[in-house]
């Protein structure tokens, strides 16, 4: 078995690249999209569904799993893979983004971040060491360091201090879990807000620490699309070429295409499943709102170009009926389709990169989503 953490690049096309990352629970082919299973399950989707649509890795949330059911309870059940019956790789984020989203319910200090649970108001402290310990209990294949995600609009003075804190926390995470200590991988998270020089500084400081991969954090937090893309194309090439690059929490299909074009390998976002539950579906012709009356007697498939179970089996009319009747099956069928769309997107990207035609592939998505194209 190849050592977990081995990252192989198979082909490049411009900055875009395709390869594979070896983990303790299998190989992840990149570029990859990771369905989000916040509390240990991808909403409305069973592990068998994920297998059927070709998911290779899913994401879990450290903050939520720590609060409920508790990381120690999960550890007693053999870890998250045994607990949720997903046998392929799992990435857990550090919970930092969720904690910092609590705003008035948290306090940041050198030691870590103190916060109150959104469930019952109980007080907790996340230190870098604690976050690593929680993720070790979950036994995820890829663990993330604790970082400070600054909000959009934070000034330079605050952001500069935050970069220093994120670096110190990252070092403490690495010290708490030395490289090669077990089969779990540990990724660093670069920050820097919306200042290019601070992004560059954060990347330099984090890459001096021997992490198994590196993430771009703090993007897609309310900033204009043009600003996000400018920072993405500035930052991604600065990350080590021989390690996997992860763009956290991003995003739309065209965001992912742009991320791949910038040299990013890994993506996650709640968008496909959240939009599925709201009746917004992604197709080869763009977004479709299944609630619209025009689909009430439409016997055609949701997307003729899609081969997922939903599109092979059911009509738009039936899907609209399920949604308007508030049937739970609508959530499952819509989610199967949207996740298939996102996974097909990265599968197509891998093929396009290998064939040397990624620029053409990118243009095809720009034609589908012209409103998202940044000049």
UniProtKB/Swiss-Prot annotation:
Pfam families: TGT. Substrate binds at residues 93-97, 147, 191, 218. Residues 249-255, 273-277 are annotated as: RNA binding. GO terms for biological process: queuosine biosynthetic process; tRNA wobble guanine modification; tRNA-guanine transglycosylation. GO terms for cellular component: cytosol. It catalyses: 7-aminomethyl-7-carbaguanine + guanosine(34) in tRNA = 7-aminomethyl-7-carbaguanosine(34) in tRNA + guanine. Signal peptide: none annotated. InterPro entries: ArchSynthase1/Queuine_TRR (IPR050076), TGT (IPR004803), TGT-like_sf (IPR036511), tRNA_ribo_trans-like (IPR002616). Pathway: tRNA modification; tRNA-queuosine biosynthesis. The active site is at 93 (proton acceptor), 268 (nucleophile). Zn(2+) binds at residues 306, 308, 311, 337. Binds 1 zinc ion per subunit. Its cofactor is Zn(2+). GO terms for molecular function: metal ion binding; tRNA-guanosine(34) queuine transglycosylase activity. Its EC number is 2.4.2.29. Keywords: Glycosyltransferase, Metal-binding, Queuosine biosynthesis, Transferase, tRNA processing, Zinc. It is an enzyme of class 2 (transferase). Belongs to the queuine tRNA-ribosyltransferase family. Homodimer. Within each dimer, one monomer is responsible for RNA recognition and catalysis, while the other monomer binds to the replacement base PreQ1. Catalyzes the base-exchange of a guanine (G) residue with the queuine precursor 7-aminomethyl-7-deazaguanine (PreQ1) at position 34 (anticodon wobble position) in tRNAs with GU(N) anticodons (tRNA-Asp, -Asn, -His and -Tyr). Catalysis occurs through a double-displacement mechanism. The nucleophile active site attacks the C1' of nucleotide 34 to detach the guanine base from the RNA, forming a covalent enzyme-RNA intermediate. The proton acceptor active site deprotonates the incoming PreQ1, allowing a nucleophilic attack on the C1' of the ribose to form the product. This is Queuine tRNA-ribosyltransferase. It comes from Nitratidesulfovibrio vulgaris (strain DP4) (Desulfovibrio vulgaris).
